[in-house]
Amino acid sequence: MRIINLFDMKLKDIISIVPLIKEQGFDAIQISPLQTTKDEEEFDWDKWWILYQPIDFNISNKRIGSSLELKKLCNFAHKYGLYIIADIVVGHMAGRDNGEVYPNSKIDKEFVDNKDNWRSFLYVDNWDDRYQVINRSMGLPGLNHNSVIVQDKIINMINNYIDLGVDGFRIDAAKSIGLEDEGCNFFNNITYNMKRNSNGELVKIVYGEVICSSNDLIDRYSKYMKVLTNYNYVGYNNNDAVIPFIEDKDNWYDPNINGLGWTNNLSTREIVRRYSNLTRIYDNTLFYPRISKDKCNEFEKAWLTDNIREANKVKIKR
């Protein structure tokens, strides 16, 4: 599956380019998170992180689009045989404006006041320590994924997405959510309680963000979903388990993030070349067309090149 990540593009604008996306050989479109965020009026490109600071589990975002627009996009994309994948933020909520790792005042007070909904507000200071990663907060107030209330809200949101026609999900920061062998039943319960789509089919496209991780950790998460990760952390033996990328929006927007910003130094042409190489090795790939830092919400045209179209046509022989 060849996925294009149209992060920060409005749903109505995506609708206008669906035919082109199909022509370029992509199979699926990953859209931005649609949960309500703490600052919905911030539209500058360098405020990209606001989309990952939700205050609820609703499906409507002033910056990206409404649930009605999402349904329209799904219906139109399906006519072209394209899947729509929703990016969902389920690891944390928005923090206070002063940077403290405590819930934002716009989050429902009853939800905030229930201490069982939250993990420790201590920061993760050792990313190689799994106990810290799944029990502490990553600079934002982390959710307790064993909480029945938290799970019910996330399951309800996922099923609302499915009702609107969404075909799959990217789970943001999945690496920070514990696994069954670590005492967390989150992924088991989420998978079990996903409803079927309008055709009576189970959702088949689910992948979690597990970047900068060992093959062992990738293998452990792949028991529950496919794993979205940066290509240089993947061994070839993981082909069916992973969805690798050369550059994602994090790397492009923030050169200092996770030590991955080195791709900022690569030309668009080099990004395309490396992506083309990925498609010769992996059945599933993700391509992020860089957004222009000079023209807000305008994407560079690399995804429209012949090289991308030819790369997406590659079928790997086993």
Where are these predicted regions, by residue range?
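Short, flexible micro-motifs
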Residues: L68, A94, I211
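Phosphate-binding glycine-rich loops and adjacent basic patches that engage nucleotide phosphates
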Residues: I29-E40, K115-V124, H145-K153, S267-T268
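Asparagine-centered polar/low-complexity signal
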Residues: G91-H92, N126, N144, N230
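Core domains of carbohydrate- and sulfate-ester-processing enzymes
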Residues: V101-M138
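Active-site-proximal helices and loops of the catalytic beta/alpha 8
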Residues: S16-K22, P33-Q35, E40-Y52, L73-L82, ...
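The substrate-binding groove and active-site-proximal loops of carbohydrate-active enzymes
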Residues: M1-L11, L51-S66, G95, R136-Q151, ...
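N-terminal structural segment of carbohydrate-active enzymes
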Residues: M1-Y83, G91, V101, D129-R130, ...
